[in-house]
């Protein structure tokens, strides 16, 4: 069973869409194995997104991700990484397919509701950033 990490971003929390997005995720066959609500500091957000440090949007991304609470979640499903990226849609909601999370709920490329890991390797690294082994529930 493959795992991926998602983060319901501050805009998702602010718009009170946590339940709606999790419902869509679970209806797509994903199982939640770890979840918590946290508020990232600018330093922690900067560490998580360090791979983007040289990109022009880095400062804005760190500012946004530390602007309010977010909800990191570890999900489990066969082909979890690819299937989740399909479910959430393109980074820019204007280019996302109909019915995807971002098409339904996101306002802009910068505030696009949800993060999704881009590879199995990164999913494991990102999951470890937010969760200890003890916080992850083994599925049956």
UniProtKB/Swiss-Prot annotation:
User: SMART domains this protein is in?
Assistant: NDK
Q: Which UniProt keywords apply?
A: ATP-binding, Cytoplasm, Kinase, Magnesium, Metal-binding, Nucleotide metabolism, Nucleotide-binding, Phosphoprotein, Transferase
What cofactor does its activity depend on?
Mg(2+)
Annotated catalytic residues: 115 (pros-phosphohistidine intermediate)
What GO annotations for molecular function exist for this entry?
Answer: ATP binding; metal ion binding; nucleoside diphosphate kinase activity
Mention any one GO cellular component term assigned to this protein in its UniProt record.
cytoplasm
Cite the PROSITE patterns for this sequence: NDPK, NDPK_LIKE
Places the protein is found: Cytoplasm
Question: What family does the database annotate?
Answer: Belongs to the NDK family.
Q: What does this protein do?
A: Major role in the synthesis of nucleoside triphosphates other than ATP. The ATP gamma phosphate is transferred to the NDP beta phosphate via a ping-pong mechanism, using a phosphorylated active-site intermediate.
* Record protein name field: Nucleoside diphosphate kinase
Species of the source: Pelodictyon phaeoclathratiforme (strain DSM 5477 / BU-1)
- Species classification: Bacteria, Pseudomonadati, Chlorobiota, Chlorobiia, Chlorobiales
């Amino acid at each position: 069973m493959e795992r991926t990490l998602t983060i319901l971003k501050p805009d998702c929390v602010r718009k009170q869409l946590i339940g709606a997005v999790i419902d869509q995720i679970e209806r797509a066959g994903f199982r939640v194995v770890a979840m918590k609500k946290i508020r990232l500091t600018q330093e922690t957000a900067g560490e998580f997104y360090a791979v983007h440090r040289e990109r022009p949007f880095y400062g804005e991304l760190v500012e946004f991700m530390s602007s309010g609470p977010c909800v990191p979640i570890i999900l489990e499903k066969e082909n979890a990484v690819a299937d989740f990226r399909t479910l959430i849609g393109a980074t820019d909601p204007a280019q996302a397919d109909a019915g995807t999370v971002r098409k339904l709920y996101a306002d802009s490329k910068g505030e696009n509701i949800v993060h999704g890991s881009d590879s199995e390797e990164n999913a494991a690294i990102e999951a470890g950033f937010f969760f200890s082994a003890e916080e992850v529930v083994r599925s049956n």
